[in-house]
Structures are given as structure tokens and as C-alpha cells.
UniProtKB/Swiss-Prot annotation:
Component of the GMPPA-GMPPB mannose-1-phosphate guanylyltransferase complex composed of 4 GMPPA subunits and 8 tag-335/GMPPB subunits; the complex is organized into three layers, a central layer made up of 2 GMPPA dimers sandwiched between two layers each made up of 2 tag-335/GMPPB dimers. Catalytic activity of tag-335/GMPPB is reduced when part of the complex and binding of GDP-alpha-D-Mannose by GMPPA induces allosteric feedback inhibition of tag-335/GMPPB. It comes from Caenorhabditis briggsae. Residues 243-364 are annotated as: Hexapeptide repeat domain. The N-terminal substrate-binding domain adopts a Rossman-like fold and has a binding pocket for GTP or GDP-alpha-D-mannose. Substrate binding is coordinated by an Mg(2+) ion. The C-terminal domain consists of a series of tandem hexapeptide repeats that adopt a beta-helix conformation. The beta-helix forms several protein interaction surfaces involved in assembly of the GMPPA-GMPPB mannose-1-phosphate guanylyltransferase complex. This is Mannose-1-phosphate guanylyltransferase catalytic subunit beta. Enzyme activity is reduced by incorporation into the GMPPA-GMPPB mannose-1-phosphate guanylyltransferase complex. Allosterically inhibited, when part of the GMPPA-GMPPB complex, by GDP-alpha-D-mannose binding to GMPPA. Pfam families: GMPPB_C, NTP_transferase. Its EC number is 2.7.7.13. GDP-alpha-D-mannose binds at D109, D216. Keywords: GTP-binding, Magnesium, Metal-binding, Nucleotide-binding, Nucleotidyltransferase, Transferase. Catalytic subunit of the GMPPA-GMPPB mannose-1-phosphate guanylyltransferase complex. Catalyzes the formation of GDP-mannose, an essential precursor of glycan moieties of glycoproteins and glycolipids. Can catalyze the reverse reaction in vitro. Together with GMPPA regulates GDP-alpha-D-mannose levels. The active site is at K160. GO terms for molecular function: GTP binding; mannose-1-phosphate guanylyltransferase (GTP) activity; metal ion binding.
Amino acid sequence: MKALILVGGYGTRLRPLTLTQPKPLVEFANKPMMLHQMEALAAVGVDTVVLAVSYRAEQLEAEMTVHADRLGVKLIFSLEEEPLGTAGPLALARKHLEDDDPFFVLNSDVICDFPFKQMVEFHKQHGKEGTIAVTKVEEPSKYGVVVFKEDGKIDDFVEKPQEYVGNKINAGLYIFNSAILDRIPLKPTSIEKEIFPQMATSGNLYAYVLPGFWMDVGQPKDFLKGMSLFLNHVQTTRTGALATGSNIHGTATIRGSVLVDPSATVGENCVIGPDVVIGPRVQIEGGVRIQHSTILSDSTVGNYSWVSGSIIGRECHIGSWVRMENVCVLGDDVVVKDEVYLNEASVLPHKVIAVNVPSKDIIM
């Protein structure tokens, strides 16, 4: 089988993390976000992945080719000269997708359990042109709702309904037969607004209800929530602790779901967790408290600092007695001096912060 991943554009909602790398390469639970998808695709026999790319294509190719070779997956890069929406990239990559097999299409910023095997079985069972994965949400009035019958046949799409019509939304994971390519022109086209309604009207589109967790990692708060859902899922489905290794000091306390890369070090009397990811070669010095946060690769957190609900980019240095909270996001190579307080601060890469940021601000 083949798959096409819609890589998208600049990832502006996840800045400053995406100012130095494309969004699919941002580390999520110590792997590039896209690698979670590629590993799940390879596990169900996908041998060719087409990446519909536009922003920092060379950087994406350099890193993902290494992972694809390890997985035994052929990567094809389909470069958009101009934005083509969510359907146009399929037309652009048509020559790579035209065969008898159904193929996957994924939004690159979706994190879930990726039940691709079950999706394929469901798609073959109903025998129609397309399958959309849908997921349950608590506040359907904020989204476009998918209305479908008990057997999955989609009747309608209702955008931000004022009255209750259902609580399932498009989860950004699809399976299509190659016949869909005849519906899509090579121009900017929305698959959700222009192609799916056509398919539903002709009875060719079905909904597969995702089990388990799901998150569209759009903004930093979504990143952190998705990380929590992911860690709790892994904790309940995997035997053994997530945070293990000789580099965690014996006096350190691990609380709840915590993922520590084996190459990272955690100092004495630290309290780590819940919902924390510590990346490769990260150094956490003594007495540090971290919760609901992720520390990306090659960063350092100094003695007795407090980090809560925050994302620290790659190669950052956090001084001693620093306090960061309320969705602080540091780009790569940021230095925070000792005893600085950051509250809901977004700091662009390569900055040095020596004064407090007591309220929401962007440090350029």
C-alpha cells in the first residue's frame, strides 16, 4: 500500500518551535511528529509514502529519508510550487497514487493510536470509494460535525452546528480508492468542503470511529494536551516504566506518566511528572521540579528551577531558580538567566532572557 501525508505550510500556530524546522520534525515524545505516523504505516505494510511538501522541503527530506530507510519505506517528495489546499496535493501526486490498491491520506499533525489495520478492514468491508476516520469531541458546536448512519455511511457535514446533530468530527486520517483522483482538479481545492460532500451525496463515503485518544497538534496547548494523552495511553498499554535508566539519580522522584530518553540525566532530589517528556542528551540539574512539560534535545535546566505547562526547545539553557509556567514556549537555542520568572512567554530562537516576563508576551 501507499500513503500520502499532507505536510502543510509554515506551522505558524506552533511557533516559535517551527521557526527553525518544519512542524513534522518537531519532537513529540522524543520522535519527530511525522515518524509516529510513518512507523504506524510501515507496521501495516505501507511501502511507499508520498510527502506533499512546501516549507523547508530539503530539511524534511534530509531527516525523514534516514528514518524511511530504516523502516524499509520508499519516500517520494511532491513539492507544491503554490498552496493547493487539502485536495490539490492528491492531484499533484496522481502519478504516484494511481494503482488498484486503496491508499492512505494523513494530516501530518494528527497524533492518535493509528488503528490503520482496522481502518483497512472497514474500508474493504463497505467497498466504497472513501473512508474518513472520525473522533468524538466534547463540544461539537466548535467543529464541523460528520453525520452518518449506524453502518458508517455518511449523510452530511454540518459546520459548527447550533443544535445537536452528532459529536463526531473529521480526524484527518483517510483511505481512498484511486477513483477519487478523477474528482480532484490540479488547483487549490478543499477536500473537506468540495470533495467530501460530492462523495457523500453519491453514497461513496463512510466514517470509521476512532477508538482511544486523538489530538490535532495545532498550538502549543494542543501539543501539551496531546503529549499527556499519548503518555497515558503508552503507560496503560506498555509493561514497565517509561522513565528508566542509570542516569536518573536515586533520590529523584518520578510521578505519573514520564518519558525520559536513556541519554538524558536527571539530578538529585528532582521531582519529575506527571506528563513530562525529557529528550535526548538533556541535563536536569539538582532539585528541579518539572510537570506537564516537554524538554527537547540537548537542553539544560539549572538547579532548583520550576517548569510547569511549558515547552523548552532544542539546545536551550535554563539557569538556576528559574520559574516557567502557563504554556511558556522557548524556540531553539534560548538562554534564560538565573532567577527569571516567565509566565505564558513565547520566546523566539537564539534569544537571551535576563528579565522577568510576568504576563503573556512574545519575546522577539
